[in-house]
Regions:
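Sec-dependent signal peptide hydrophobic core
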Residues: 5-12
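A sequence/structural signal for flexible, mid-protein segments enriched
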Residues: 21-349
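Positively charged n-region of N-terminal signal peptides that target proteins for export
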Residues: 1-4, 21-22
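Residue-level detector of intrinsically disordered/flexible regions characterized by low predicted structural confidence
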Residues: 4-5, 221
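C-terminal motif of bacterial Sec signal peptides marking the signal peptidase cleavage site
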Residues: 16-19
């Protein structure tokens, strides 16, 4: 799955924060603050939640957040906290009651974490097997999920609805581009999904490249539409649309290949191919809490200060829901002809 789909660098705030205020008292020296990040996805067998700790500081007792983030014992609570997710469903009078299903969170160690802000390559995460519970949901009911984390005498809670159903899909099966200058646009259409307040889409064009009769190397160019609220999207019935310019693919390839011709010493004997369905569309739907979190951090940027938005009671972070899907699609005959006509070395296989 593409990293940028709803990733929004959620882990970027798992660090130690300067003193400020909302619902948690941050003025005690070196007080640990629960920081929680979790996105429920009903289509996945396993859902992961990060439960870490940050430390407040003040000017008299400063903390270097970057140094602490690299120390596993500083970011993690000792042992395993009692954590679980309780399912609720709507009933008479729009009241929500417990269904009896509880997702117990266990811990596991991820061993392939790349180097970055936080300690690596081994990181502790919490997880739950929830697909069996989610698949029993009735389409005529609404559901919400409440997270409970017990830390000593404190209980941290958060709540979210569940985004998505099996009708969520991309309808478009082919993209249409042209090489000639054009101000026109085309659309990618997809079916809306319950509880989503925004969608994030990207398409990736994959191709193969061989230099001097060497081995084929996979290349790609991508275009991101960015996170769009449902109010920003065109809609017809239950179908949303996003628009892309007809020249988009050719502009991307021109930037990637670096010239309008391959007949020069830097590109000898370059041959390129593409598959019958060379474009992958990545689409994600996200819940209200995640959208609010993205919007706030887009305005303030990431820093060592506590973000203005959190839906974690007794801590910080975000607990929300998303649904990701991918679809491989073709490109029109005109697009193929225009690609073969450019001096970029594209050939039919």
């Amino acid at each position: 799955m593409k990293k940028l789909l709803l990733s929004v660098s959620l882990l970027a705030c798992l660090a130690c924060f300067n003193a400020c205020s909302t619902d948690v008292d941050l003025y005690a020296d070196y007080k640990d603050i629960p920081v929680v990040y979790g996105l429920l996805d009903a289509s996945q067998d396993t859902n992961y939640i990060r439960i870490n700790r940050a430390f407040s500081s003040n000017n008299d007792h400063p903390i270097n957040a970057n140094e602490v983030a690299l120390i596993a014992d500083s970011c993690n609570y000792p042992g395993k906290l009692r954590a679980y997710i309780v399912e609720y469903q709507s009933g008479f009078g729009n009241q929500f009651t417990e269904t009896g299903d509880v997702l117990e969170l266990d811990t596991m160690t991820v061993h392939d974490k790349e180097e970055g802000i936080f300690y690596s390559p081994n990181q502790k995460v919490y997880y739950a097997k929830g697909k069996a519970v989610f698949s029993n949901n009735s389409p005529s009911r609404r559901y919400k999920y409440r997270l409970f984390i017990h830390k000593g005498n404190d209980t941290i809670t958060a709540e979210t609805g569940l985004v998505g159903d099996d009708d969520f899909k991309v309808i478009t099966s082919q993209l249409n581009f042209k090489a000639a200058e054009s101000s026109k646009s085309n659309q990618i259409n997809f079916v809306e999904t319950p509880n989503a307040v925004f969608y994030d889409m990207e398409f990736v064009f994959h191709y193969w490249e061989s230099v001097n009769n060497g081995p084929l190397t996979q290349k790609q160019v991508s275009y991101s539409f960015g996170a769009k609220s449902i109010e920003e999207l065109d809609k017809d019935g239950n179908v949303f649309s996003v628009s892309y310019g007809e020249n988009t693919l050719f502009n991307l390839l021109k930037d990637a290949i670096g010239a309008d011709t391959i007949v020069n010493p830097n590109h000898p004997n370059v041959v390129r191919y593409f598959d019958p369905k060379p474009v992958t569309i990545y689409l994600a739907a996200g819940g209200d809490e995640l959208y609010n979190y993205i919007q706030v951090n887009a305005q303030t940027g990431y820093s060592q200060t506590i973000p203005d938005y959190t839906n974690i009671s007794g801590g910080y972070g975000v607990f929300s829901s998303r649904r990701n899907l991918t679809k491989e699609v073709g490109i029109s005959a005109r697009t193929q002809t225009d690609l073969y006509g450019k001096p970029w070395g594209f050939k039919q296989q």
